[in-house]
Amino acid sequence: MVEVYRSADAQAVERSVEAADSLPPLRLCADVEALTLGVRPPETEALRVRVDELRGRVDVARTLGLSGRIVEAHAQLSALMPEVDATDYRPLVAEAELARAGASELPEERIAALERAVWMAEVSHHDRVAAEAWVQLVEARGTGANEFVRALDAVARADAAIERIAGDPELRIRLDVA
């Protein structure tokens, strides 16, 4: 986030509070159980280095989107996806698809990215990303695509995903108002 805001334009500054609000809560840093469960690290040192590098690039692109530079964020994330997919590290694919969904202006594209993010997150036990993706899927189907029945079907899955991460109150509120 620092990298994007180092050269921020007026639009980015206006959206900086929203971008800061999108960061995971600080209390998660103290939750030892949450930090040690779930996602397995990459199997080799070389893969870990590659995943860290790509994760950094995904985070920069995601921050661009949060700062209002959606077109640039979408272009960067679309260009990154083949490299992310090539790692075959599903937690990273889930994170990248979630970021790509956030930078997608077309409802169908956003939903497709969220569905893939959910699948990759669930299969790799990346519960926080799965919960976030499920909540966004409810929002995207209910408001963006007018798929109300499918949105209602996704509510139960989103609720279960939130429970797996100890009932995150912020996600719970977003689900309740979706």
Briefly describe each language-model feature range:
Residues 52, 85, 89-92, 99, ...:
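Structural signature of alpha-solenoid helical repeat junctions
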Residues 2-71, 142, 159:
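N-terminal alpha-helical interaction modules that lie
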Residues 22-24, 54-68, 95-107, 132-147, ...:
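Tandem amphipathic alpha-helical repeat scaffolds
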Residues 5-8, 12, 84, 121-124, ...:
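Alpha-helical junction/boundary sensor with strong preference for TPR arrays
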Residues 7-15, 43-46, 89-92, 164-173:
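Acidic, Ser/Thr-rich low-complexity linear motifs
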Residues 78-86, 115-123, 156-164:
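Amphipathic alpha-helical segments of tetratricopeptide repeats
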Residues 3, 119, 126-139, 147-153:
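Hydrophobic or amphipathic alpha-helical targeting/insertion segments
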Residues 73, 80, 93, 110, ...:
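Solenoid-repeat scaffolds in large eukaryotic assemblies
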